[in-house]
Amino acid sequence: MALYTIGEVALLCDINPVTLRAWQRRYGLLKPQRTDGGHRLFNDADIDRIREIKRWIDNGVQVSKVKVLLSSDSSEQPNGWREQQEILLHYLQSSNLHSLRLWVKERGQDYPAQTLTTNLFVPLRRRLQCQQPALQALLGILDGILINYIALCLASARKKQGKDALVIGWNIHDTTRLWLEGWVASQQGWRIDVLAHSLSQFRPELFDGKTLLVWCGENQTLAQQQQLLAWRAQGRDIHPLGV
């Protein structure tokens, strides 16, 4: 029977080791074997279970409720992400920034960055992106909390093994989304730094020798696609984000 370390499982299942530990310790979802030195070892059944947990979470089930669903073999797929958005919105409206930070941190420990970005943070930010001053203020608070939290996550990830990369926004206007994409990349094994300002004219030769992860927004233009491919054909170490 094949056995895998937590790092190997993280790569196989595309999930942060911190999240795997939280699923085990806090929620009892996983029961890995242990080496004599106390290191976790997972088998193929554990990997299947992790993927099943991810499926439930992607459908909006709170982590605390997944264990019951796993034991019941239920095929129901509820979508609870709207409820999670409302909880986050409540914290924003309460102006209790300490509680808001703690809630975001807990979600970050319980869920993969990609899942949170796709199902929670991006949809709620879209709801807040309007001309109403009150909602604009809430969006500003949320963005500040997110960037601060992500910066801490990236700093922690840089202490681990991985390949260094610089995240760059090319002709974008949503800087917070750039940080979210960098956070997702950091959970895929990259050690990330973020160029804080978007570049309207992107010249990769200015970053010679660096691996560049480029975010062009949700709707990458054909010209951008062709230019990125041309740079890669020239040997530039450039990778598009979010595609």
Swiss-Prot record:
Residues 3-72 form the HTH merR-type domain. Keywords: Activator, DNA-binding, Transcription, Transcription regulation. It comes from the Bacteria. GO terms for molecular function: DNA binding; DNA-binding transcription factor activity. One of its GO terms (biological process) is regulation of DNA-templated transcription. Transcriptional activator of csgD, which is required for production of the curli (AgF). This is HTH-type transcriptional regulator MlrA. It comes from Salmonella typhimurium (strain LT2 / SGSC1412 / ATCC 700720). The gene is mlrA.
